[in-house]
Amino acid sequence: MSQSNNATTSQHRTAIPAGAGTLFFVQTFATLGFAVLYSTLVLYATKKLGFSEDNANAIMGVFGAFNYGLHMFGGYLGGRYLSNRNLFVLGMVLQVFGCALIAMEGVTGLYWGLAMFLTGSGLNVTCLNMMLTQRFAPDDDRRESAFLWNYAGMNLGFFIGFAVAGYFQLSENYRALFLFATLGNLAAIVVTLSRWSILADISTPLKEVSRSQWLRRLAVGIAILIVLVPVIRMLLTHAEFSSYFVVALGIVIFALMTVVTFRHRNAGERRRMKAYLLLALGSLVFWMLYQLAPMGLMLFSENNINLNVYGIRVAPQWIQNINTVVIVIGGPLMALWFNRLRQRGWNIDIPAQFSASLFCMGLGMLVLPLGIHLAGGDGLVAFKWIAISYVLQSIGELLISPIGYAMIGKLAPPRYQGVMMGCWMMVTGVASVLASYISGLMPQNAGSTPLLTNPGYSQVFNALGWGSVATGVVLLILIPLLRRMIHREPSVA
């Protein structure tokens, strides 16, 4: 009897739950289309459709903000109306049609295609993460490793998507590129449908309703999807208003979550929800700096970094692949490393990782003023400094992002898991808008030189770096408190 129990416990600790491996491949394929659009939208709009750079960048900003902002609603819609797996497949179908419309190479097709794509991608990311977190019990430590693997799969999708986008960009064959994006989306649908039964929802409000109620909710959910497309189409044409709207919505959602938390009756769950709110505030600082990559950091790389490396001209967009490589390689390695440290008695937990991530981000910013100080006579900064910065930022991302997703299952009561997962992802949407405001504080490069703009960049990077380090110190001080808030009392037999 004892041997049987030990075997069962050992299997529980080592075996991968059914569906977790499938979701790795689903994540990879689902990311392809987003990677293509994310990396090509501005170039496509300016080179093929004749948009001004300001117009194209404004659309890209709204694209990023609403992609993340819709994550919160995706958790609610999936958990209460459509089910996570149904909403995921419907979202991928919208992405297929969206990419096909964009491939028509017209302005009308672009706006409607983006609206359909955003509706799908914004809603289904939360569903994918919820399908994964529901494979594990709240106290199952394997959840963190599974999310690290899943996060590596997502970045593998980004790597492939960026590589293919660059290949077609050389010939500006955008039609073929966006049609390729539809193939990735279709592959994600096929894999999901092939493993449909093992990806069923667990412990969501929708599981508790009758068949007739489920059908009514399904109809309402589909109607919401249909209405969202023209609404997002309209908001894409009003980028400034949309940015303010995302920030205001984020503030309202955080305020509502605070009220819900303090009114929650279960003392243990209320304590863990408070820890969630504190960690969310800390993560906002990290993601605000992280989202500078396609904005202020991209312009700094293009204008102030020496991009001739060993005689090879490096495109600014390729620098993003430093992040992708670190995540793909580092994700599984960090999972193995953390498992070994825990076996040796190290307390590697959520508060410690969050604090460490902010230190990494701060150092990633602070190496740039050092590189600027050591710049050549022409003001160009050596490529190694931006590379080091991205490596440090990527390590910070590994510490906070997949662990942030995994912590929802640990801290959120079952009835709030979908909404809290969406709120967590909406933090990134708000951070994206705030990053655009910070980018506006950086020097303007038009008609200037690196020698003139370097002091301004150095000042901003110093402020951002020390701000991130200071936030990391605050979380470091709060680690004992956060650990007490997160701790679960042992159940009484």
Task: Name each model feature, range by range.
Residues 1-18, 138, 169-294, 298, ...:
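Intracellular loop-helix junctions on the cytosolic face of multi-pass helical membrane proteins
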Residues 37-55, 293-319:
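Short amphipathic helix-loop junctions that connect adjacent transmembrane helices
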Residues 61-78, 125, 321-334:
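Central cavity-lining transmembrane alpha-helices of secondary-active solute carriers
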Residues 71-106:
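Conserved MFS/SLC helix-loop-helix module at the cytosolic interface between two early adjacent transmembrane helices
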Residues 80-92, 340-359:
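Cytoplasmic membrane-interface "Motif A"-like loop-to-helix N-cap segments
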Residues 93-111, 356-378:
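C-terminal ends and interior cores of transmembrane alpha-helices
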Residues 123-137, 398-412:
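Intracellular juxtamembrane helix-capping segments at the cytosolic ends
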Residues 142-163, 169, 182-188, 192, ...:
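Glycine-rich segments within core transmembrane alpha-helices of 12-TM secondary carriers
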